[in-house]
Amino acid sequence: MSALTPASEVMLRHSDEFIERRVLFAGDLQDALPAQFEAADVRVHTQQYHHWQLLNRAMGDNVQYGLTVDAAFVAECDTLIYYWPKSKQEAQFQLCNILALLPVGTDVFVVGENRSGVRSADQMVEDYATLVKIDSARRCGLYHGRLDTQTEFNLEDWWESYQLHDLEVKTLPGVFSRDGLDVGSSLLLSTLDKHMKGKVLDVGCGAGVMASVLSKLSPKMKLTLSDVNAAAIESSRATLAANGIEGEVIVSNVYSDITGRFDLIISNPPFHDGLQTSLTAAETLIRGALKHLGVGGKLRIVANAFLPYPDILDATFGSHEVLAQNGRFKVYQATVARAPRDAKKKK
């Protein structure tokens, strides 16, 4: 997230317009532009914890992480710069929330890569603001308008659910596989045994599906779920509650806020950060697993078959096995066969 994205480069072409403005950045931020942006005041709201981590170092309390925006946090803002995400439902949710809090007359800028679907921005907000395209460069579009009417936002209106066997899965916009179980996760779930014991960590938990299924198969396992996405965190908590399942749900950038060791780590790790391809999270997941698994502990992940995870698994654990595969996905497992290095040092 160090280099500027094409969308941010387009914004910089208009940077002189913001010198005296009180700006709120929101949406699919992929770089540190807000930390170097010149304006009377700059604030950021993000649903992504790893984005908050980066920006918080430079901006402190002017960066807010959470599912929804705090009204007091944006009370003085007169300009919104919104980065369009790849999920249209996520954009609808975030804009409806933000535009319910900003005053009528607020300048609204929407920027995004054309492939993200940003061209539909004007239609999405036409009841609240008239957006006009004011720039096009780097395969991005920049739109501007003024808020004519505040939106009405009620979080309860955005919840959806679906049934998976005897489980009720609760989801919010922006959560992976919001409308049903994806093929990769289904393949991983097919490898889980019944009556396992110990502690399990579900990294990138989404709506909490995998951990919930595991709980039904092995009720004695102690569950910990983690994700960077605020919508996923709230969805997982709601899924556990709806099914009477006990578990701890933690906001964490892979292992950043995780302590202790586990008997099993499961994950369907992402290989995109927004629209950009990124293996960072998966590589961190694999390489950092030794510090969070006990002797005999297992890391079990599902991934697209073309991704280069076997080499990383072998370099980290010494070997791996393929538990299941289909035409697109493979389920890999690696086992800690000896005491992790940091444990040896303590002896």
From Swiss-Prot:
One Gene Ontology CC term in the entry: cytoplasm
A GO term, aspect molecular function: nucleic acid binding
UniProt keyword annotations, A-Z: Cytoplasm, Methyltransferase, rRNA processing, S-adenosyl-L-methionine, Transferase
Catalytic activity: guanosine(1207) in 16S rRNA + S-adenosyl-L-methionine = N(2)-methylguanosine(1207) in 16S rRNA + S-adenosyl-L-homocysteine + H(+)
Subcellular location: Cytoplasm
Pfam family, one: MTS
Enzyme class: transferase
Matching SUPFAM superfamilies: S-adenosyl-L-methionine-dependent methyltransferases
EC id: 2.1.1.172
Keyword Lipid metabolism: no
Matching NCBIfam families: PRK09489.1
Family: Belongs to the methyltransferase superfamily. RsmC family.
Subunit details: Monomer.
Function: Specifically methylates the guanine in position 1207 of 16S rRNA in the 30S particle.
Protein's name in the database: Ribosomal RNA small subunit methyltransferase C
Organism: Serratia proteamaculans (strain 568)
